[in-house]
């Protein structure tokens, strides 16, 4: 049977439990038509690049599906009807990716970075409250006197 990766976005105001129920419902449709879900990943509530149907965020869910084409057409039909689903995308793949998807690996990498703790000296490092513009910078000399715009160019050159 063909292999598919299916991602759908659920509305931001849907609870995690509602998204889980929606995933269970879609999985039931797939299994009812002779397919099977080999992997389910919930990527959580993430920001959208642009507003979709007045939503700025959405719950992202990935399903790896092994089943006939009729399964895909039926779950897409069900998702068009369901008001909680903002967008969906199904892609046929040659083989499913083993282990966590790229999005989950990225989330793990971000969590590892957060484990490093705060930087020494806070955000500003060793600048001790000196911003870019505070106090005398000492890297510039005094300003040159302004030349009058009214004076002719020959008089300025002397």
From Swiss-Prot:
Q: Which stretches does the entry tag as region Disordered?
A: 92-158
An annotated GO cellular component of this protein is: cytosolic small ribosomal subunit
MF terms per GO, please? small ribosomal subunit rRNA binding; structural constituent of ribosome
Per UniProt, the keywords (alphabetical) are: Ribonucleoprotein, Ribosomal protein, RNA-binding, rRNA-binding
Q: Report biased composition (Basic and acidic residues) as residue ranges.
A: 92-149
One Pfam family in the UniProt entry = Ribosomal_S6
Protein's GO biological process? translation
Q: Which family does it belong to?
A: Belongs to the bacterial ribosomal protein bS6 family.
PANTHER family attached to this UniProt entry: MITOCHONDRIAL 28S RIBOSOMAL PROTEIN S6, SMALL RIBOSOMAL SUBUNIT PROTEIN BS6M
Q: What does this protein do?
A: Binds together with bS18 to 16S ribosomal RNA.
Q: What else is known?
A: The initiator methionine may be removed.
The entry's protein name is Small ribosomal subunit protein bS6
Q: From which lineage does this chain's organism come?
A: Bacteria, Pseudomonadati, Pseudomonadota, Alphaproteobacteria, Hyphomicrobiales
């Amino acid at each position: 049977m063909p292999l598919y990766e299916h991602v759908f976005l659920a509305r931001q105001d849907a609870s995690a439990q509602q998204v889980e129920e929606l995933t269970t419902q879609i999985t039931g449709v797939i299994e009812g038509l002779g397919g099977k879900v080999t992997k389910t990943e919930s990527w959580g509530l993430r920001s959208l690049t642009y507003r979709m149907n007045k939503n700025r965020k959405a719950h992202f869910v990935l399903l790896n599906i092994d089943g006939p084409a009729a399964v895909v057409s039926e779950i897409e039909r069900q998702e068009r009807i369901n008001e909680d689903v903002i967008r969906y995308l199904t892609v046929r793949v040659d083989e499913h990716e083993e282990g966590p998807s790229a999005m989950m690996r990225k989330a793990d990498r971000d969590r590892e970075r957060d484990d490093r703790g705060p930087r020494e000296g806070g955000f500003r490092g060793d600048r001790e409250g000196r911003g870019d513009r505070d106090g005398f910078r000492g890297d510039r000399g005094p300003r040159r006197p302004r030349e009058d715009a009214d004076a002719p160019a020959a008089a300025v050159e002397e």
